[in-house]
Regions:
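Elongated alpha-helical scaffolds
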Residues: 59-69
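Active-site nucleophile-His-acid catalytic modules used for acyl/amide transfer and hydrolysis
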Residues: 56
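Generic secondary-structure microfeatures
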Residues: 19, 68-71
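Alpha-helical structural motif
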Residues: 19-23, 63, 101
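N-terminal leader/targeting peptides and immediately adjacent processing regions
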Residues: 1-41
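Charged interaction scaffolds used for protein-protein
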Residues: 1-14, 42-53, 61, 73-165
């Protein structure tokens, strides 16, 4: 089974990642706004989804944003963004492998109670969106959804959840 790390040591203190209301509140800083090149429409992605999608791409910057959000429940003891970034950089330099941290982050968001429903809805919507399209657009959406399922399985060693659409 793929190793899953949901704790991080910063300044000799261990912090456990939690998906809570405060996670979402902190994650709002990491929401993204992009413009679809094909349609010209503005695409807004909330912070939790933005972090999740970045984790799927094993983006270390999104891993730092995840830990910044996931330690927000510590309130007065929360490590700073810079402390988290330095720790993640040190782990990458020492071990050469952040994958267990990506696995832990993805599983926490996708499987633990607070954001489980939100992410199940995201998976459902990805699957359903391909069913509402026609021709090449439908094929492209289906390939994209399959790619994300494969990515999740490749990283975490298990399927995201049973998608019934």
């Amino acid at each position: 089974m793929t190793e899953s790390i949901t704790e991080i040591r910063i300044n000799d203190k261990i912090f456990k990642a939690k998906g809570t209301y405060l996670f979402g509140k902190t994650a709002k800083k990491y929401a993204t706004n992009e413009v679809d090149e094909e349609t010209g429409k503005k695409l807004e992605t909330d912070g939790v989804t933005s972090i999740f999608m970045g984790l799927m791409q094993q983006d270390p910057d999104k891993l730092i944003e995840f830990w910044h959000s996931a330690t927000s429940h510590y309130l007065k003891e929360q490590p700073s963004f810079e402390e988290i970034a330095t720790t993640i950089e040190d782990i990458a330099a020492e071990t050469g492998d952040l994958k267990p941290y990506f696995v832990g982050a993805l599983r926490m968001l996708n499987e633990d109670g607070y954001y489980k429903g939100k992410l199940q809805t995201l998976w459902f919507m990805m699957k359903r969106s391909s069913q509402n399209k026609k021709g090449e657009e439908k094929e492209k959406a289906k390939e994209s959804q399959e790619l994300f399922v494969e990515l999740y399985e490749e990283i975490t060693g298990k399927p995201p959840y049973e998608i019934k659409a």
